[in-house]
A protein has these predicted regions:
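A contiguous loop/helix-start segment that scaffolds small-molecule binding in enzyme catalytic cores
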Residues: 2, 76, 155, 162-280
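Glycine-rich, flexible N-terminal cofactor/catalytic loop recognition
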Residues: 1-57
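Conserved helicase motor
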Residues: 54-61, 135-136
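Short active-site oxyanion
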Residues: 23-29, 103-107, 155-156
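General beta-strand structural signal in soluble alpha/beta enzymes
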Residues: 31, 108-111, 158, 184
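Class I SAM-dependent methyltransferase SAM-binding "motif I" and its flanking Rossmann-like core
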Residues: 94-152
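Glycine/small-residue-rich loop that forms an oxyanion/phosphate-binding "nest" at active or ligand-binding sites
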Residues: 64-113, 117
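Alpha-helix capping/helix-boundary segments
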Residues: 35-37, 84-85, 114, 164
């Protein structure tokens, strides 16, 4: 059986009795960091006889065959990431797929999640939301990533490293608008937990004001269609006017998006819709 264990995201007291019992009884543990797993067991006074196998992003591909063979031989393997749920911006998904393809039974031990914890702490709408993992590390790719999310009407949740949070928020502000509401949740459930709520502009000011350490989850409000100040027809008209004076379609869309402080995707989609209606 493959056991996917949700571990505490900060406070070891959040570990369930079911998790503790499973660690005590399982034969193998695939741990993202064996030292952190050992520390958790020490904090919870868990004594176990499981063989701990290193299983992290760098060796995930090569370890899948070994772990799958154990599962196929009727051994129980518990997957333990550093915190939270396996497969959620952590190793696990490929092993889950391999286990299913081998007809191995899968069991999940529910528990803490940085995604839902941050969502609740943010004070933003919880009825519809999406989790986007980590933004790209390079500025160009990250800016495009945010542009594609700018018109997302669901609350958007993602992780970010502390040393990139300022530049990340700047790119988010450029795509979403600096007045979009959001929250930064840092070191959740730990002693130095901090939650900062406000507009993206205010979050940028906060990020620039101090040295930021620890694990960060960012929550941003979804796009409100009613907040758009300009109709699609006006965006399209401006694109045509720029094309008439020699600008390319791509450059015209970029200029219109900048002028009206909307994502390029909004202008592009308006043009596509216009074309699909045979007006171009």
């Amino acid at each position: 059986m493959l056991i996917l264990a949700c571990l505490p995201i900060g406070d070891s007291r959040d570990a369930s009795a079911h998790l503790i019992q499973s660690i005590q009884q399982v034969q193998y543990v695939a741990a993202e960091d064996s030292r952190k797993f050992a520390r958790l067991c020490q904090d919870l006074n868990i004594k176990h006889n499981a063989k701990v196998i290193s299983f992290f992003e760098g060796n995930e591909s090569e370890k899948i065959e070994e772990l799958t063979n154990l599962l196929k031989s009727q051994k129980d393997v518990l997957v333990a990431t550093d915190a939270g749920a396996p497969g959620i911006s952590d190793p696990g998904y490929r092993l889950i797929r391999a286990a299913l393809q081998s007809n191995v039974e899968i069991k999940v031990l529910p528990g803490p999640s940085a995604v839902t914890t941050a969502l609740l702490l943010s004070g933003l709408p919880t009825d519809r939301f999406c989790f986007e993992g980590f933004p790209p590390r390079t500025q160009g790719a990250r800016a495009k990533w945010f542009e594609e999310l700018a018109q997302q009407e669901r609350t958007v949740i993602f992780f970010e490293a502390p040393h990139r949070i300022t530049e990340c928020l700047v790119d988010a502000g450029a795509a979403f608008g600096l007045d979009r509401s959001g929250a930064i949740c840092r070191e959740m459930s730990k002693h130095y937990e901090e939650v900062v709520r406000g507009s993206i502009a205010e979050l940028i000011t906060w990020a620039k004001s101090k040295e930021i350490l620890g694990e960060i989850t960012v929550v941003l409000a979804g796009f409100d269609p009613a907040s758009r100040q300009i109709a699609d027809e006006d965006l399209i008209k401006m694109v045509f006017e720029l094309e008439e004076i020699g600008e390319s379609r791509k450059e015209a869309i970029a200029q219109v998006a900048k002028k009206y402080a909307v994502a390029k995707r909004v202008v592009f989609d308006a043009m596509v819709t216009y074309k699909s209606e045979d007006k171009i």
